Amino acid sequence: VLLRKLFIPLSLILVMLAACNNGPAPEEQIYEHLEEAVSLEEEFREQQEPIVELERKEQELYNKIINLSMDEFDQIKEYSQEAASLVEERQEKIDREKESIDAAKEEFDKIEPIIDDLDEEEQAEAKEEAQKLVETMNNRYDAYQQLYESYQSAIELDKELYELLQQEDLEEETLQNQIDKINDSYDKVIEANEEFNQYTEQYNKQKKTFYESTDLNVEYSEQENGASESESNEQEKEDNPDSEKDDTDQE
């Protein structure tokens, strides 16, 4: 089960800027891009529960399959086809998720040239915090790319598994080798996911620090979007560890 921490949206309730005649001040422009990036990750956020649900359904089918004997091959084949269909649905949602992350990163990147417009003396702290934010976001994005690639590899192995299960002459050793590959692959997914979560948590804290270093009056939402949703998913993972395929005892 993929567990992602999410951006925490912040609300700008009042801005008092002296440079309004020359357009929005740099810190206000940065704020707008940062919060637009949050909005662009909404699609990413919306994929989380459906992905978990698809994984749960697939695990149920897999459990049914391994409890059947080869005398019930027609049922095994039917369940395998259903599971393969669920894998395809997961693929679609993961791709949507990535598109959302990519769009948010593209929006975020717009702040880099604006950081140079922050005053070296009067806004030195804000400038330093903004630069830290860029570094963390880049690390977070790189971590997501690794997570996406790891998950893609795991999905391909899942597809291969359900193709194998539709072969009546499938040998137990071949099946077990495939299951081992899948479990190893999902271990990498979990590791990459933990790194992504760490960078997201770090980013959310640093964004708050950046806002506090400016003249922006920002209200911080009480809804702990990133932490609470991730913690909820962590519990779901414990209750439904889809990332691990059980060994088979089919005969």
Residue ranges and their predicted role:
Residues 26, 103, 198:
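Contiguous, function-dense segments enriched for cysteine-driven chemistry
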Residues 2-5, 22-23:
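General N-terminal leader/first-domain-start detector
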Residues 97-183, 189, 201, 210-220:
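Extended amphipathic alpha-helical interaction segments
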Residues 22-98:
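Immediate post-signal-peptide N-terminus of mature secreted/exported proteins
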Residues 4-13:
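Sec-dependent signal peptide recognition
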Residues 15-19:
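C-terminal motif of bacterial Sec signal peptides marking the signal peptidase cleavage site
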Residues 187-251:
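Extracytoplasmic/luminal low-complexity segments enriched in Pro/Gly and acidic/polar residues
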